Amino acid sequence: MTEIADPRDRLIVALDLPSVQAAEALIDRIGDAATFYKIGYQLGYAGGLALAERLAARGLKVFLDLKLHDIGNTVEEGVRSASGSGATFLTVHAYPQTMRAAVRGRGAGLRILAVTVLTSYDDADAAEAGYGLPVAELVAKRAAQAAEIGIDGLVCSAAEAGSVRRIVGPDRLIVTPGIRPAGAEAGDQKRVMTPGDARRAGIDHVVVGRPITGAADPRAVAQAIVADLA
């Protein structure tokens, strides 16, 4: 696990919202209770990439969850473009050619995270998609490939975090979605964990969306999660 001085940096708030205006309103409500925000497809296609630059200019950290996967040159140039946004993290799918291209394009300030297997997948989903391995084995294989290629960190479920840590060692980042405070609904995530359990499992950053974005007091929820992560 990497050393992180400010426990707020361990929480990544997922801005899974339909507009930049909604995202900015949420960020204002959260205030200094959070320092790290994730922008994915929904917001990214609605002006979120420009928002990423503005947030970075304010000293906030940004995770571009774009899950790139294409031919090598396209990924390399896409990563190179994303590096100009000021983002801290960018995701790619954990296919060897994609990861190698991302490493070539990342530049100095951007960290590349490889998505092993989506946290909405279980073994039945993996089989339906044509993978010949159960989820745990597929995650382990992709984690080992990512470490060999030089990826900065892995995105995996909390259920696989321990095995991933053993494979990639102490210095690579582990980022985990599907984190739910105690008592929160799992939603469409199938492999979940509480923030405190995630911290004890050696996870560096947790991604939390709906429990914060849908809360009556998102600042209070963010503060409670950070306290659980400290």
UniProtKB/Swiss-Prot annotation:
Its EC number is 4.1.1.23. Catalyzes the decarboxylation of orotidine 5'-monophosphate (OMP) to uridine 5'-monophosphate (UMP). Keywords: Decarboxylase, Lyase, Pyrimidine biosynthesis. It catalyses: orotidine 5'-phosphate + H(+) = UMP + CO2. Homodimer. One of its GO terms (biological process) is 'de novo' UMP biosynthetic process. Pathway: Pyrimidine metabolism; UMP biosynthesis via de novo pathway; UMP from orotate: step 2/2. InterPro entries: Aldolase_TIM (IPR013785), OMPdecase (IPR014732), OMPdecase_AS (IPR018089), OMPdecase_bac (IPR047596), OMPdeCOase_dom (IPR001754), RibuloseP-bd_barrel (IPR011060). CDD domains: OMP_decarboxylase_like (cd04725). It is an enzyme of class 4 (lyase). This is Orotidine 5'-phosphate decarboxylase. One of its GO terms (cellular component) is cytosol. Belongs to the OMP decarboxylase family. Type 1 subfamily. The keyword Signal does not apply. One of its GO terms (molecular function) is orotidine-5'-phosphate decarboxylase activity. It holds the Pfam family OMPdecase. SUPFAM superfamilies: Ribulose-phoshate binding barrel. It comes from the Bacteria. The keyword Lyase applies. Substrate binds at residues 16, 38, 65-74, 119, 180, 189, 209-210. The active site is at residue 67. It comes from Methylobacterium radiotolerans (strain ATCC 27329 / DSM 1819 / JCM 2831 / NBRC 15690 / NCIMB 10815 / 0-1).
